[in-house]
Amino acid sequence: MPMKRLFRAQILFLVILNSCSNGEESTSTPANQATATTTTSTTTTTLAPEPPSISDLLNASYPLNIAHAGGDQDYPHSTMYAFQQAVVEGADILEMDVRITADGVLVVHHDETVDGNTGVSGTVSEMTVAELQLLDNAWWWSPTCWPCRDLGEGDYPLRGARTGYTSPPDGFTAEDFRIETFFDIASAFPEMPLDVEIKDDGALASGAIAALISDIDALNRRDSVIVASFSSDVIAEFKQAAGPDIATSPGTDEMVGWVLNGEPLGDHAVVQVPPFYGDVEVLVPSFFETAKTAGVDVWVWMSDTSQENYDYYLELVAMGADGIINGRPEAMERVSQ
């Protein structure tokens, strides 16, 4: 897989360069909320390699390693730290969830509230980005069990890395453990394709869609981003607003109509599915045959943490999965080789 090795070499060069070009001084407080920080940085102008486009990846000869939230079984969900580690470990695509804040900024965050990651209560859409970025996004992460919020204090080794209560790992700073904006994540990894799920729906969806399109266009990333949502209405609204040149995956209603009722699938590049919907097995041979006939790739996300291991990833690839949205990118990289 020489092309993949070339992309890997370019990516690692940029990660190392970015790590060496930034320095930071910050205050500390023993809590799960950080104080304001003062950042001093030296910028080196470097011509980044363009990321492979979604079309390039659909033609790949190997199963794609798609790091779910940066690899949330191995690293704190949706942190800059996790995404950097995923790149080093061989991810082909960074997967992330986005939501809109009270002040109209798109942030990378899965849940409607911050409770599950930060140890603080609050609703993302009711908080400003400044308020969100004070929180410790690694508060509840544990390498022994994620998501588990009833373990002993010592089972959360990065708790306080954002606030100064715990020292961040070597080479990282407190900022790497905060809730990040989509723009900053996409800017930090210009060489990485992105799989972006819009979590907001209803009244919040339009704001999230507008912000996402604005950020994608500002970064000239239309051909290296694929957009997904569980809501078929959100995907339809996104496609109408963005036009046809940003790749998408169908929402649940459209998927059900396609698979069960034989309804035509819209203009999508990829279907993203779990191995099971409840008790219903999705990845049966007829599903892969239907996808092949429709000309779409199949990316699989895990429906249970027990599936997050090398053997299961290998089994999914053997079934016919084109990409694995996984929480352990290092394990998936061994499958891809």
Regions found by a protein language model. Name each.
Residues 21-36, 41-337:
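Phosphate-group recognition and catalysis centered on beta-loop-alpha active-site segments
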